């Protein structure tokens, strides 16, 4: 039987976690990045399709390649983050379905409908980005997800000649709490949910 996690874990993962814009000068190791993926990969996706592909940018050279794609409001926070993850989706994710979903011919569901393939890849890679954020929080890291960037520039700079397309960016590191804004409100249950 499943058991609820502790109140402390809920605080770490949700209620006390914040989106960070400033970072401490504490590096994030490659081993930690591997740990993050080892956790996030278990999050569910449609037919186990797992379309997300992630580039972890850790070097000054990588950040300079990314710089022209960033909006002005996201520039400094990204250049100073220890890691920036480009969460992309593989437009031909279905080629891995014989391995990932061997129960039937799931590949044909998507090869016969390019629109379904694109919708599935984008939706599920977005879900996987959320799993990455939760994995970061679980390992004591902070994040700053962003959609304010030039996707075409990122695709040209990092994914030219491939089947990958960028979805969003996530800055990862140890946040500087002195640079946090006041916590913004969230919608109440009554405002966001319905019961039928």
Curated annotation (Swiss-Prot):
Any GO molecular function: 3-hydroxypropionate dehydrogenase (NADP+) activity
GO BP annotations listed: nitrogen utilization; uracil catabolic process
Reaction equations catalysed: 3-hydroxypropanoate + NADP(+) = 3-oxopropanoate + NADPH + H(+)
Keyword NAD applies: yes
Keywords: Flavoprotein, FMN, NAD, NADP, Oxidoreductase
Enzyme class, first EC level, given as a word: oxidoreductase
Oxidoreductase keyword on record: yes
Cofactor(s) named in the record: FMN
Signals that turn on the gene: Up-regulated by the nitrogen regulatory protein C (NtrC also called GlnG) and repressed by RutR.
InterPro entries recorded: Nitroreductase, Nitroreductase-like, Nitroreductase_HadB/RutE, RutE-like
EC number: 1.1.1.298
HAMAP family recorded: Oxidoreductase_RutE_HadB (MF_01204)
PANTHER family membership: MALONIC SEMIALDEHYDE REDUCTASE RUTE-RELATED (PTHR43543:SF1)
Function: May reduce toxic product malonic semialdehyde to 3-hydroxypropionic acid, which is excreted.
Family as reported in the entry's similarity comment: Belongs to the nitroreductase family. HadB/RutE subfamily.
Protein name: Probable malonic semialdehyde reductase RutE
Protein's organism: Escherichia coli O157:H7
């Amino acid at each position: 039987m499943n058991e609820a996690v502790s109140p402390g874990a809920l605080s770490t993962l949700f209620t006390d976690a914040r989106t960070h814009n400033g970072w401490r000068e504490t590096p994030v190791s490659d081993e930690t990045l591997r740990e993050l993926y080892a956790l996030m990969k278990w999050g569910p996706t449609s037919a186990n399709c797992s379309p997300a592909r992630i580039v972890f940018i850790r070097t000054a050279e990588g950040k300079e390649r990314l710089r022209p794609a960033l909006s002005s409001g996201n520039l400094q926070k990204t250049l100073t983050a220890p890691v920036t993850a480009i969460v992309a989706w593989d437009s031909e994710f279905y080629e891995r379905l014989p391995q990932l979903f061997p129960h039937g011919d799931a590949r044909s569901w998507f090869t016969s409908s390019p629109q379904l393939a694109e919708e599935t890849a984008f939706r599920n890679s977005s879900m996987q980005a959320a799993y990455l954020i939760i994995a970061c929080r679980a390992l004591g890291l902070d994040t700053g997800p962003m959609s304010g960037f030039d996707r075409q520039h990122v695709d040209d700079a990092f994914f030219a000649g491939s089947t990958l397309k960028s979805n969003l960016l996530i800055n990862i590191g140890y946040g500087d709490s002195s640079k946090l804004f006041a916590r913004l409100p969230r919608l109440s249950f009554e405002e966001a949910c319905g019961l039928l």
